[in-house]
Amino acid sequence: AHASDRDLTNFRREHVGFVFQFYNLIPSLTARENVALITELAPDPMEPEEALHLVGLSARMDHFPAQLSGGEQQRVAIARAIAKRPSVLLCDEPTGALDIRTGMVVLEAIEHINRELGTLTMVITHNAVIADMADRVLTLSDGHITHERRNPQRASVTSLAW
């Protein structure tokens, strides 16, 4: 089936949440305001407070990005992505710029979102350890799938061997 550029844009806007390696937060807006931006575009968004609660940032929602740690900023970015209740969540290197402990907090937040919202979550990473959390793992090389496997037993974040 072929879709127009407009149809694809509308699909992405309504059904896909993006979490980038670099958080792309607006420095002059609080965490709550950064999340609220996306809710203006979505047909049935959750309240920014609910999204921030889901990632464990209820107490930090009125802080500006410069007042947040790297892990907290990444969780604001996740909250912003999930506030529109996407059916697909794409995460590009969500732990790439974080230390191990903070990376684990971010992965736990993503895992929680996946469970709570039933969101199909795709994580793009160079960290092979994270693959043990997935139902299905695809390995890419030069833009092509070179290997595929399924995990019969998904690992929890706390059981990962960093």
Positions of the model-derived regions?
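ABC family nucleotide-binding domain
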Residues: 1-134, 139-140
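Conserved beta-strand-loop-alpha-helix hinge in the C-terminal portion
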Residues: 136, 144-162
